[in-house]
């Protein structure tokens, strides 16, 4: 039987912890990982987080750039030979307007539905998202709405060791990103998204966008 343990932290807080399989992840943690990726990837305001400086983005080479937050979020995606992190960054660069980097375009993702995780097998889950990306052209430009309906497949990975006190801000951010012990291993179109948002698009001129192409999903 799994044990329940009482733990008191050095700051005096008390927690009750339950013993779980090392591949177990709480459903809300899984959902929050997907939500975090989407918010960091698609919420652009042209400013480096925590500063008032313009976000010049991260250079991917060949004149391609992504926002700083999108670059950080990409570390939630599986990399290496079996991963598709670089491919996602390339696609994101293709749809990121250059005017984002001088503060003339802003973007916001509005998530209207995020499913409870469905376990595919031990340590792997799928989550469906129905969302709308809103591009705001400044000053006084026409706003554009773009449907973003996706199925995310995630798997449990090793939880990283805490960072030392002298670690850089980027190292600390990456640790926080990976501290849930999850990574995204597949992103595909959620075909059920239209049923979820039925009636939502009438008269809005919302268009579909497929940034995650079939050659690497």
Regions found by a protein language model. Name each.
Residues 9-40:
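Short extracytoplasmic
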């Amino acid at each position: 039987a799994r044990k329940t343990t009482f733990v008191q932290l050095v700051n005096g807080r008390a927690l009750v912890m339950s013993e779980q399989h090392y591949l177990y992840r709480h459903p809300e943690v899984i959902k929050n990982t997907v939500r975090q990726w989407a918010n960091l990837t698609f919420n652009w305001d042209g400013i480096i987080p925590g500063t008032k400086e313009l976000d010049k983005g991260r250079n991917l080479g060949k004149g391609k750039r992504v926002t700083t937050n999108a670059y950080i979020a990409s570390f939630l995606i599986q990399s290496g030979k079996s991963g598709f992190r670089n491919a996602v960054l390339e696609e994101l660069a293709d749809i990121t307007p250059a005017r984002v980097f001088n503060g003339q375009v802003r973007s916001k993702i509005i998530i209207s539905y995020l499913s409870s995780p469905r376990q595919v097998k031990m340590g792997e889950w799928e989550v469906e998202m129905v969302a709308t990306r809103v591009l705001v052209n400044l000053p006084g430009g026409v706003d554009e709405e773009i449907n973003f309906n996706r199925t995310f497949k995630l798997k449990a990975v090793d939880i990283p060791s805490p960072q030392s006190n002298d670690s850089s801000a980027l190292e600390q951010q990456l640790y926080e990103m990976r501290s849930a012990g999850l990574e995204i291993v597949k992103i595909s179109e959620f075909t059920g998204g239209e049923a979820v948002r039925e009636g939502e698009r009438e008269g809005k001129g919302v268009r579909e966008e497929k940034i995650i192409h079939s050659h690497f999903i």
